[in-house]
Amino acid sequence: MNLNQLFCERIQYYRNDPKRIQHFTKVHSYAKLIGEREQLSPEELYILEAAAYTHDIGIKPAEEKYGSSAGKLQEQEGPAVARGMLMRLGFAKDVIERVCYLIGHHHTYTGIEGRDYQILVEADFLVNLYEDGRPDGDGGFMPDKAAVETAYQRIFATETGKWICRSMFALGGVS
């Protein structure tokens, strides 16, 4: 299955919602970069990329059912929607199962199992730490420095993810 078909399907799913499209596109970009630099196998990278494109697929049904996009609701609602989409697009059963597992856990930060899971969480954090910041007056955002430092200490485990976080948010010891 071609990941670009999934990318296009996700754009269509969130048509008229550029914020959501921008978000999953950025998460995918960081996930792919980290995955490649951390030398994931082609199979692991493929699953990671599919999960990065679909990780927030549960937002739409969560908002429709509960009026909320809370992380736990995304984890609850996302796998079923993703499973249907991935099956329709012809993804292999083992890929679908792992992607759905990752979607169903991507806001759970304890007991992270697997490099794909760790990297997906790091990529999502890189984007969310910026997007959840306060407006900076120039059309961008000013991230909460304490939140960045806490996430760096508690969440980031890969060398590449740590390096991107330090570089992006000007944490001490950037190298």
Protein language model annotation of sequence segments:
Residues 36, 59-63, 83-91, 108:
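Short helix-capping and hinge/turn segments at secondary-structure transitions, especially at repeat
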Residues 45-64, 78, 100-107, 124:
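His-Asp-centered metal-binding catalytic motifs of divalent-metal-dependent phosphohydrolases/nucleases
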Residues 27-30, 72-88:
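An active-site-proximal "capping" alpha-helix that borders the catalytic cofactor pocket
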